[in-house]
């Protein structure tokens, strides 16, 4: 197994996932790589302190196949769902996205060059009860851990938890509470690479104290510095809780999952309902400016692009 880690913080101000332009850096964001080699093939995990990858994904898949002989089914790309990082679906950020592909491919090469073994691969799980779900939905508290050990010392700890991150600022680049968790784990386990992946947590969020709304209102009233300080304090608290939970799992009984590596990838086709009628689409289109066109994130009318596209299909006779 081999590991690598590199900074992927943007130099220029870019549109972040939260819709704001980044205004400096509070904490660097990183990409991390774990390569497992069973002697006949490799499995590559890449995690990154971003909400998504998009632009870099097809580039990486092609390069690992053609230059490294690794099938895309063996390239596992995992985001932390970080909101305070450049979003990849805005055209102004595409150059950054191409740079990400180059940076991450280099880290994959670095991890392969650093392979050592034999290693033991183990799996464990536990719970992190400091999250909640919107409404009355059930909450998935599970934390999963994949630990790679070499010569009785962990060299990589890949863990996941299903939640949006708690960010450390409003308008600065930071890695949120998962970033602080990884920092704490790496400090507690010498020479380990901590890797976090967001699990299925689109409806789940960190649980906040009962007086959180009062504290945030007071901090906003006091100004940006006070508000950011409150956000950072809470993100660090949640990061500590996550790190403690992962450490408990790592120190508990783990299941040996070593052996030959198998991996597959499949595109699943889902049936679609018939589109709404042209008349219904025209009525919907009356609710927003007629000349808005097709717009990208974070434009407020981006969510209505589908109506204009459907009308174009009707105009060209492509709706069936």
Locate predicted features.
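Non-catalytic substrate/cofactor recognition surfaces at enzyme active-site rims
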Residues: 1-320
């Amino acid at each position: 197994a081999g590991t690598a880690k590199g900074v992927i913080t943007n130099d220029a101000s870019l549109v972040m996932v939260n819709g704001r332009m980044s205004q400096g850096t509070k904490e660097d964001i990183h990409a991390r790589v774990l390569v497992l080699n069973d002697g006949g093939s490799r499995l590559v995990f890449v995690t990154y302190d971003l909400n998504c990858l998009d632009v870099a994904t097809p580039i990486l898949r092609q390069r690992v196949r053609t230059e490294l002989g690794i099938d895309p089914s063996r390239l596992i790309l995992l985001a932390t769902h970080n909101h305070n990082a450049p979003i990849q679906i805005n055209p102004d950020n595409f150059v950054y996205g191409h740079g990400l592909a180059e940076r991450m491919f280099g880290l994959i090469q670095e991890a392969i060059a650093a392979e050592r073994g034999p290693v033991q691969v183990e799996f464990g799980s536990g719970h992190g009860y400091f999250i909640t779900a919107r409404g009355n939905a059930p909450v998935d508290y599970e934390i999963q851990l994949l630990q790679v050990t070499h010569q009785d010392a962990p060299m990589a700890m890949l863990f996941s938890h299903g939640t949006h991150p708690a960010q450390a600022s409003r308008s600065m680049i930071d890695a949120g509470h998962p970033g602080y968790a990884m920092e704490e784990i790496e400090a507690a386990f010498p020479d380990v690479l901590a890797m976090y992946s967001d699990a299925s947590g689109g409806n789940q969020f960190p649980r906040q104290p009962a007086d959180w709304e009062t504290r945030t209102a007071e901090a906003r009233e006091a100004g940006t510095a006070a508000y950011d300080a409150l956000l950072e304090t809470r993100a660090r608290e949640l990061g500590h809780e996550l790190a403690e939970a992962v450490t408990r799992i790592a120190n508990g009984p783990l299941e040996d999952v070593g052996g030959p590596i198998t991996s597959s990838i499949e595109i699943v086709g889902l049936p679609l309902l018939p589109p709404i009628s042209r008349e219904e689409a025209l009525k919907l289109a009356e609710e927003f400016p007629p000349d808005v066109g097709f717009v990208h994130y974070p434009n407020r009318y981006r969510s209505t692009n589908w109506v204009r596209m459907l009308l174009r299909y009707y105009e060209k006779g492509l709706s069936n």
